[in-house]
Amino acid sequence: MSEQATLGTAVVTGASAGLGKIYADRLARRGHDLLLVARRADLLEEVAAGLRAKYGVKVQTLAADLAAAGDLERVSKAVAADPSITLLINNAGLSTLAPVALTTSAQLQSMLDVNINALAHLSHAALTAFKARNRGTLVNIGSVLGFYTLPISSIYSGTKAFVVAFTRGLQEEVAGTGVKVQLVLPAATATDIWELSGVPVSALAEGTVMQAEECVDAALAGLDLGEAITLPSVNDAALLTGFTDASAKLFGASQTSKPAARYLATA
């Protein structure tokens, strides 16, 4: 069996630019065949042609708007039906950074559709197939804003908080099986998402923006290390342990039938 057949096919959403494009490059370099998904067919084919020429791997493209129900269903069916697929990178995402009152209903709906609905449905399609074969890896791209909210990130942070909770739950579901689930939580990263967010990357403090290539390389290193949660820019791994431990303690402390004493003061 060839190395490429062993590695299988990797699906990357949002593959025409940014982190997705770099993921496609790195996975092709490792020997994966690819199924690349993004809205613009011309950009997708340009990326695919470059990867075929550079690495000699098989690269398929599927132009789809994951905010559109019909397109999402097509991609979900493709992921579920192809037994060669061993890896899904759920990277596609949208960001509008503005107070809720200054965000249009269309912008709000688009973030919900792509960041939550599409990610959840594609995760469902992939994990159902992976669990049936007891093999496969799901990578969901979240954000550090999934556990920290700014005055301009209420909607975006809310969608990424879903990614955090949803993916952590999936990790519990597949524990002890041959299926792996990784949650990647980048901080500010130099990608074209900033052009649409309403906040130019140049407005961020110097030294706080990671290059996209470094972010993906760190995320893949975390995957190789077997990390459940990868924060590419956080040096002190104990911070993550403290955060997850505190969350577990808070949940444990809530498991009582009685109100907290501070709510029982008499008038």
Task: Name each model feature, range by range.
Residues R30-E46:
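Conserved glycine-rich Rossmann-like NAD(P)H-binding loop of the short-chain dehydrogenase/reductase
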Residues S123, T159:
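Active-site helix of classical SDR
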Residues N91-T96:
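Conserved NAD(P)H cofactor-binding loop of Rossmann-fold oxidoreductase domains
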Residues S143:
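Residue(s) in the substrate-gating loop at a strand-loop-helix junction
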Residues S16-A17:
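Conserved glycine-rich cofactor-binding loop
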Residues L183, V199-L239:
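C-terminal helical subdomain
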Residues P99-V100, Q107-L112:
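Substrate-binding pocket helix/loop in short-chain dehydrogenase/reductase
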